């Protein structure tokens, strides 16, 4: 079929030049996409393609092929690989340049101008001062080397006296030009006055048969002061003597009744956390109240336990005893081996005198005391042995390394010898 015989409107009927122009415009609109194929396929103006298209019957494509299911082989589908995106399909993100590094504060900070008029960083200035100080110290050391021993000793003594006499500068905490320590002392002084007034008011209320609630109202402020670790020095200062007012809170009222349980519980718990020393105990007198709570039957069991624990800790401060087992001092005495053997031979009566025998006595003195002792009647009775429950004196070790003992037989070896002789006699009779 020729081009002239093709139906109107078919691709073959259009002029070749117009078709080429339309295809060029479509390629420009697609922005360089690859859907069009190569140049030979896009041409489409040759006679062979037009002849093939003109011979196809359009009625054969009347059925809808899109709705029919398509069979896909799974083995083939699994072998397919995902296509990677080409560089032309994705737009590249513009590359950013390097960001400037942040400079440290020490490099930026500079002090005032130096003698030469230049502004230098603070680190450089500190290094210069350190170097100058080191040079001065080296010069002083060289000067001391040239001095006599007496002059060196005199200078060392002067430096030691200056260091001992010089008082350390005590920095006082300030906030907004307000001295916090003075404010704390004033607050404690005002609270002391309020606590004493509350104690007097509770005693007057009990005399009038009314409930004593003034201490309970003031209790939160008292516990807040006692539990603040930052002002413990002010609380324990003997000059301020805040614990004396705390003692008034714990003391019984005039009618003999104890304060409320909440007061006892809160103050006892706070006292166990405070590092109280001997001077504070003497100035405040709070130990007397703790002793009363320990011996009285009125407080509850937990309050008595706390009072007993406080009494034990404070007694160590007064008696200068430590609760460290390593620092414990144990009295030691030398043991008299001859007296121990003599007591074992004489039987059970020596057990009573073993604990009563003082150190340093000879065997003759021990036997003389036993002979002069009054007679014990009713010997046929069985009496418990009077041994102490615990020992307070430890024997002193007489072992000398590298030296052979004079008496190698241990204590109680004579009984083994008697038993051995008895067994030998029995064998001889057989």
From Swiss-Prot:
GO cellular component, one term: nucleus
Biased composition (Low complexity): 1-14
Biased composition (Basic residues): 95-104
Region span, Disordered: 1-153, 402-430
Subcellular location: Nucleus
Keyword terms: Nucleus, Transcription, Transcription regulation
Main location: nucleus
Biased composition (Acidic residues): 52-63
InterPro entries named in the record: RNAPII_TF_IWS1 (IPR051037), TFIIS/LEDGF_dom_sf (IPR035441), TFIIS_N (IPR017923)
Superkingdom classification of source: Eukaryota
Gene Ontology biological-process entries: poly(A)+ mRNA export from nucleus
Membrane-crossing segments per the record: none
TFIIS N-terminal domain: residues covered: 244-321
Xref: Pfam families: Med26
Segments of skewed composition (Basic and acidic residues): 15-33, 124-137, 406-420
Entry-linked PANTHER family: PROTEIN IWS1 HOMOLOG
Function: Transcription factor involved in RNA polymerase II transcription regulation. May function in both SPT15/TBP post-recruitment and recruitment steps of transcription.
Family of this protein: Belongs to the IWS1 family.
Official protein name in the record: Transcription factor iws-1
Species, as recorded: Neurospora crassa (strain ATCC 24698 / 74-OR23-1A / CBS 708.71 / DSM 1257 / FGSC 987)
The gene coding this protein: iws-1
């Amino acid at each position: 079929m020729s081009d002239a015989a093709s139906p109107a409107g078919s691709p073959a009927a259009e002029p070749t030049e117009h078709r080429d122009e339309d295809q060029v415009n479509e390629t420009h609109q697609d922005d360089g996409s690859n859907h069009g194929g190569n140049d030979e396929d896009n041409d489409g103006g040759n006679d062979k393609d037009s002849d093939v298209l003109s011979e196809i019957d359009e009625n054969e494509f009347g059925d809808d092929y899109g709705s029919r299911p398509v069979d896909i082989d799974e083995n083939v589908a699994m072998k397919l690989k995902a296509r990677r995106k080409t560089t032309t399909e994705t737009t590249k993100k513009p590359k950013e340049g390097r960001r400037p590094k942040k400079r440290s504060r020490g490099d930026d900070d500079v002090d005032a101008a130096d003698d030469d008029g230049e502004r230098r960083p603070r680190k450089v200035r500190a290094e210069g001062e350190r170097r100058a100080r080191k040079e001065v110290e080296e010069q002083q050391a060289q000067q001391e080397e040239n001095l006599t021993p007496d002059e060196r000793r005199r200078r060392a003594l002067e430096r030691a006296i200056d260091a001992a006499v010089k008082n350390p500068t005590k920095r006082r905490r300030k906030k907004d030009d307000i001295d916090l320590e003075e404010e704390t002392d004033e607050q404690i002084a005002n609270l002391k006055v309020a606590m004493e007034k509350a104690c007097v008011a509770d005693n007057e209320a009990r005399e009038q048969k009314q409930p004593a609630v003034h201490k309970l109202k003031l209790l939160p402020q008292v516990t807040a002061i006692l539990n603040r670790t930052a002002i413990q020095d002010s609380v324990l200062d003997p000059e301020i003597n805040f614990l004396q007012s705390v003692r008034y809170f714990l003391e019984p009222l005039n009618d003999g009744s104890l304060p409320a349980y909440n007061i006892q519980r809160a103050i006892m718990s706070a006292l166990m956390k405070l590092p109280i020393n001997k001077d504070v105990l003497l100035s405040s007198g709070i130990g007397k109240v703790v002793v009363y709570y320990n011996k009285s039957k009125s407080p509850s069991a937990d309050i008595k336990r706390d009072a007993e624990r406080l009494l034990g800790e404070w007694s160590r401060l007064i008696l200068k005893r430590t609760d460290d087992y390593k620092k414990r001092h144990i009295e030691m005495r030398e043991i008299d081996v001859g007296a121990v053997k003599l007591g074992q031979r004489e039987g059970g009566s020596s057990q009573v005198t073993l604990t009563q025998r003082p150190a340093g006595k000879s065997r003759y003195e021990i036997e003389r005391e036993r002979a002069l002792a009054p007679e014990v009647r009713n010997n046929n009775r069985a009496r418990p042995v009077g041994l102490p429950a615990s020992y307070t004196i430890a024997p002193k070790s007489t072992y000398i390394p590298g030296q052979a003992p004079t008496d190698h037989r241990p204590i109680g070896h004579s009984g083994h010898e008697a038993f051995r002789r008895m067994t030998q006699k029995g064998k001889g009779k057989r």
